[in-house]
Amino acid sequence: MEGTSRALSYGFEVGDMVWGKVKSHPWWPGHIFNEAFASSSVRRTRREGHVLVAFFGDSSYGWFDPAELIPFDANFEEKSQQTNSRTFIRAVEEATDEASRRSALSLACKCRSKFNIQPANEAGYFAVDVPDYEPGGVYSVNQIIKARDGFKPGEALAFVKQLAAGPHGCDQNGLEFIKNRARVSAFRKAVFEEFDETYAQAFGVHSSRPLNDTSKVSKQLAKEPTRGIGLFVFP
């Protein structure tokens, strides 16, 4: 599609988190939405050469020329402080939560449960259950690969050491801190062993290794991503 091609020419991909400006509103956090997941009524409003952006906080959306968008991460510090309105703060909180989940996505796999990652209804997309986040988040193969490439063991270890040496010396509201914290937490859950064999042997505890509970399967393989769109439209 022409809109997607233009997005690529500006360094964006479908799924990328961005800031978009609408008339008198402040720059608002959102993400470039795959048109395949949109309703027919939304697709009918499509504008040539534009991409569909779903915004956080108020379920609004709009068609944007990629030239009108700016990257989410690089502009977070400035744009997240624009106003104290409750609606805007809620949108930033939702966007920050999504950025955290995408960071934790790097450690999602079928190691513990084969149901963690399931094919979505759109080719090339998967519904992923990331621990501590809303289940059934839908991501493309490229997004999952990008998330995994973003996990650097050495950097994660350096982050933990930095926290241990000076827990109050970090900007805990900064986006990088939030994303690093999500990765470390996800790693902790990925390697956590409920059954400690060494402990059991040392203290003579006769407990059995728990079996994976396959009954806790996410029944919500959404037809569209959890961040839905469609209540309001910006021209």
Question: What feature does the model see in each segment?
Answer:
Residues 1-4, 218:
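Acidic, Ser/Thr/Pro-rich intrinsically disordered low-complexity regulatory segments
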Residues 3-12, 44-202:
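Epigenetic mark-reader domains in eukaryotic nuclear proteins
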Residues 27-35:
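Short beta-strand-centered aromatic/proline hotspots
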Residues 40-42:
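Structured beta-rich ligand-binding regulatory domains in large eukaryotic signaling proteins
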Residues 178-235:
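Extended, charge-rich intrinsically disordered regulatory tails
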